[in-house]
C-alpha cells in the first residue's frame, strides 16, 4: 500500500531543501512574476491520520487548494507513513498559480507535504515550525487523527495555533469531548456548514412568539444520513439551546423529547430533516434536498399552512 504522501501531487525533495527551493521559486522583482501574486494571509496545516484513504486525502487537499485561491495560504500537509521506521522524514513541494477572468485576478499558492513517523511528535513539531510563515496565524485541520494522538500534540505541535479544526461528520470519535487546552479555539466544520440552515430556521421561526412555539411541544426529531451525522448532532444541540427558554412558558417543557435518528435511506432524498411535533396537532418540518443547495419548510403553527423554499448553502 502506498503512503498518503505518494498519493498527493508535488515534487519529491529532501526535507532540508524545501525552504530553499521555495525562495528560489518566488525570488523575482518583476511585476508579472508569480511572486507578485503570492501574499499569504495564514498558515493552514492539514493533518491526516492512519485510516484516511487516498481518495479522502485528495478530496480534502483539493478543497484546501480551492480555499487558498480565495484566501492565499501556505499549506502544510502532514502524512503519516508506514514505510518510515527510523524517525526520518520525506518531503514534497507543490505550487500552482490560478488565473481568474483577468490577469489581475491571478493567485499563486504553495503546499509543503511531509511524510513522517507518527510516534515522532517532537521532531514533527520542530519541522512544522520551520516551514510555517512567520508572523501569520496558523490553523490546524485534523482529519482522521485519533483523539489520544491529538492530546499528545497539545504541548508541542499545537502551541501557538490560532484555531484547531475538525469535521465531526468525518471523524469516528466525538472530538468535542476531547480535553482541549482552549475549547474556544476549536471549530467543527459541520457546525460551520449549518450557518445558512440556522439562519433560515431562525428567520422563519422568529415570526412566531416564543410562548406559542413552546406550548404543547411534544418532541423535536432530527433525522440524518451517515454523511451528515455531524450536522445532525450540532443542529439538535443548537435547537435544545434555543428552546431552553420554553420552561419559562410551559411547565411541561422539561418533558420535551429530543430525538436523533440515523436514517440510511434518507441519503437519496432528504439527508437532513427536522420536525417539531405538538400534542395539539400543530407541526413544523424542515428538510434538506439531497441535490442542490435548497431545502424546504412545511409548517402549521397556528396560522395558515405554509410551505416555502429555503437556501441552505451560501
Predicted regions and their residues:
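Flexible loop/turn segments at secondary-structure boundaries
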Residues: 85, 147-148, 229-230
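C-terminal structured domains
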Residues: 21-32, 40-42, 61-64, 71, ...
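A contiguous, surface-oriented mixed alpha/beta subdomain in the mid-to-C-terminal portion of proteins
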Residues: 169-172, 176-263
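Internal, hydrophobic cores of structured domains that mediate oligomerization or house catalytic pockets
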Residues: 94-101, 105-206
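Short secondary-structure transition/capping segments
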Residues: 88, 151-153, 260
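Short, flexible beta-strand-to-coil junctions
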Residues: 49-51, 225, 277-281
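Structural alpha-beta junctions
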Residues: 65-77, 132-139, 158-165, 240-255
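An N-terminal, globular interaction/scaffold subdomain
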Residues: 1-140
Amino acid at each position: 500500500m502506498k503512503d498518503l504522501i505518494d498519493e498527493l501531487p508535488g515534487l519529491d525533495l529532501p526535507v532540508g531543501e524545501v525552504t530553499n527551493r521555495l525562495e528560489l521559486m518566488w525570488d523575482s522583482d518583476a511585476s508579472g512574476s508569480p511572486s507578485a501574486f503570492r501574499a499569504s494571509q495564514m498558515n493552514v496545516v492539514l493533518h491526516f491520520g492512519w485510516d484516511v484513504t487516498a481518495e479522502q486525502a485528495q478530496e480534502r487537499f483539493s478543497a484546501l487548494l480551492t480555499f487558498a485561491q480565495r484566501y492565499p495560504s501556505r499549506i502544510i500537509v502532514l502524512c503519516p507513513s508506514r514505510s518510515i521506521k527510523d524517525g526520518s522524514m520525506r518531503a514534497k513541494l507543490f505550487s500552482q498559480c490560478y488565473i481568474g477572468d483577468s490577469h489581475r485576478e491571478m493567485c499563486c499558492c504553495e503546499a509543503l507535504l511531509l511524510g513522517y513517523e507518527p510516534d515522532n511528535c517532537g521532531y514533527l513539531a520542530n519541522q512544522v515550525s520551520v516551514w510555517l510563515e512567520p508572523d501569520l496565524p496558523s490553523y490546524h485541520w485534523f482529519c482522521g487523527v485519533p483523539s489520544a494522538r491529538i492530546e499528545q500534540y497539545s504541548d508541542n505541535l499545537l502551541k501557538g495555533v490560532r484555531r484547531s479544526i475538525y469535521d465531526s461528520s468525518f471523524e469516528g470519535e466525538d472530538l468535542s469531548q476531547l480535553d482541549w487546552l482552549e475549547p474556544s479555539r476549536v471549530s467543527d466544520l459541520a457546525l460551520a456548514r449549518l450557518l445558512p440552515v440556522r439562519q433560515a430556521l431562525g428567520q422563519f421561526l422568529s415570526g412566531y412568539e416564543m410562548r406559542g412555539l413552546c406550548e404543547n411541544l411534544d418532541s423535536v426529531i432530527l433525522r440524518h444520513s451517515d454523511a451528515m451525522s455531524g450536522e445532525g448532532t450540532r443542529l439538535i444541540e443548537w435547537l435544545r439551546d434555543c428552546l431552553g427558554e420554553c420552561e419559562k412558558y410551559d411547565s411541561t417543557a422539561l418533558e420535551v423529547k429530543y430525538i436523533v435518528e440515523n436514517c440510511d435511506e434518507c441519503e437519496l432524498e432528504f439527508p437532513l430533516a427536522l420536525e417539531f411535533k405538538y400534542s395539539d396537532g400543530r407541526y413544523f418540518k424542515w428538510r434538506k434536498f439531497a441535490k442542490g443547495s435548497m431545502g424546504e419548510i412545511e409548517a402549521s403553527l397556528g396560522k395558515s399552512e405554509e410551505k416555502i423554499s429555503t437556501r441552505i448553502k451560501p
